[in-house]
Regions:
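Membrane-anchoring hydrophobic helices of lipid-metabolizing enzymes
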Residues: 1-88, 97-101, 268-274
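Non-catalytic C-terminal accessory region of glycerolipid acyltransferases
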Residues: 1-30, 145-274
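Structural motif corresponding to alpha-helix initiation and N-cap regions
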Residues: 70-73, 121, 145-148
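Catalytic core of membrane glycerolipid acyltransferases/transacylases, capturing the structured
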Residues: 81-141
Length: 274
């Protein structure tokens, strides 16, 4: 169901522009020497304890804080055989730590996910790394090559990968912003299914009003989308890109003909809806 509430946020003009400031705590050189994909034994041990902490603390907290309801987990079970060689999940990015909601939705799987490099220099950096964060480098071609190799390795080893393809987080924004095409290029090159996930909102009512003022969250899992292997990589990327954007909007109750339904994924042309 489509629901929006004016919470007084001032959204940036560009749809991929960030609206938060991260306290800078450390200088990290995200260059060609950085270890983008941690495969150490110590990292695996931390991931083991992460799984326990998520079930005992993380998932209950995000459920209570956001009134989280999850729809569509049956689709993961129904397509289990098709997803056994890995998948890419995508979701709109609408509040801090909405990734925990995604992790709860696809449990018991743990993923990797590319993220804004500034977050990896802030107070949450250690936790972001443990939950699978891979910083996206900028301004360095050799660093970007190594980053892409890390992403390729995740997919080649049949693991799951998550993207927030809008490129930034906008607090409680109800519409789906344009999606960056790189996500779908990875899917097309590796022939991996893309699982669309969206977060929509509902009004706080009853006892939920005692726990906060912001809208509650509904998470929707869609059917997996598969690259068209009869097309070239570019054509398959474009097709998947278009299909995913349409489906994510429909999943959030935004249908063709509605005032905020959008087909133009050019970020420079996007007009914010509130």
């Amino acid at each position: 169901m489509y629901y929006k509430e004016d919470l007084g946020y001032v959204y940036p003009e560009r749809s991929d522009e960030h609206m938060i400031e991260v306290k800078h705590l450390r200088d990290t050189h995200f260059d060609e020497h950085f270890n983008y994909l941690d495969k150490s034994t110590w990292f695996k041990i931390k991931r083991f304890f992460l799984r326990i902490a998520l079930y005992l603390v993380g998932f209950p907290v995000c459920t209570i804080r956001h009134g989280l309801r999850i729809y569509g987990r049956d689709k993961l079970k129904k397509n289990k055989e098709l997803l056994k060689d890995g998948a890419i999940t995508i979701c709109n990015h609408v509040f801090m730590w909405d990734y925990l909601c995604v992790m709860k939705a696809i449990r018991p799987r743990l993923q990797y996910h590319p993220g804004w490099k500034t977050n990896f220099e802030g107070p949450n950096a250690p936790f972001i790394r443990i939950v699978g964060g891979i910083p996206v480098p900028t301004g360095n071609i050799r660093a970007m090559v190594k980053f892409k190799k890390a992403i390729d390795e995740v997919l080649e080893t049949k693991q799951w990968l998550h993207f927030f393809p809008e490129g930034s987080m906008w607090f409680y924004y109800p519409d789906i912003r344009p999606l960056k095409p790189a996500v779908f290029n990875f899917a097309a090159r590796h022939n991996k299914p893309v699982i669309p996930i969206t977060i929509s909102f509902r009004k706080r009512t009853g006892l939920w009003k005692l726990l906060g003022k912001k809208p509650l969250a509904d998470l929707h899992i869609g059917d997996p989308l598969f690259p068209d292997t009869t097309l070239s990589i570019k054509e398959a990327t474009d097709k998947l890109h278009k299909e995913a954007y349409h489906i994510m909007q429909v999943m959030n109750g935004i249908n063709p003909g509605d005032p905020t339904y959008n087909t133009d994924q050019n970020i420079d042309n996007y007009k914010k809806t509130m």
